[in-house]
């Protein structure tokens, strides 16, 4: 039941708590976005996750909120990744770039895509997609 899954999240188990939250989200068992965000915060703040697993949870929280979030909220969620050397940094930059592109804020979008293009350890697929977007849609 949903109650059991929430209990597992609150137990702060490094393996089963994230899996419980993802199961709830994937199966749309809870529709309240504020409630889901509080479970993300439990994982991020209270659960002793490996650093890159924690960063993945942060990225998933941003993805979960991206459709409804305002710019400042999305940036606040992603800042720990954007200001790090995490393997998820290029993903976070790409999400922000696409967010601004979808909102027709081309200059901001271009800045984020350029950050990806200039990132040494960027995910190669994301770097390629960023370069394509820059060449195809954002070139002068």
Annotate each language-model stretch with its function.
Residues 28, 39-140:
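Soluble extracytoplasmic domains of inner/organellar membrane proteins
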């Amino acid at each position: 039941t949903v109650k059991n899954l929430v209990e597992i999240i609150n137990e702060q188990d490094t393996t089963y708590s994230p899996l419980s939250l993802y199961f709830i989200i994937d199966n749309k068992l809870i529709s309240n976005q504020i409630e889901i965000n509080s479970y993300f915060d439990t994982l991020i703040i209270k659960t002793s996750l490996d650093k890159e697993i924690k960063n993945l949870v942060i990225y998933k929280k941003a993805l979960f909120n991206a459709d409804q979030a305002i710019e400042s909220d999305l940036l606040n969620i992603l800042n720990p990744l954007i200001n790090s050397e995490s393997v998820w940094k290029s993903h976070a930059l790409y999400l922000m770039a696409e967010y601004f592109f979808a909102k027709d804020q081309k200059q901001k979008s271009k800045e984020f895509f350029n950050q990806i293009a200039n990132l040494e350890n960027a995910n190669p697929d994301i770097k390629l997609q960023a370069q394509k977007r820059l060449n195809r849609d954002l070139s002068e």
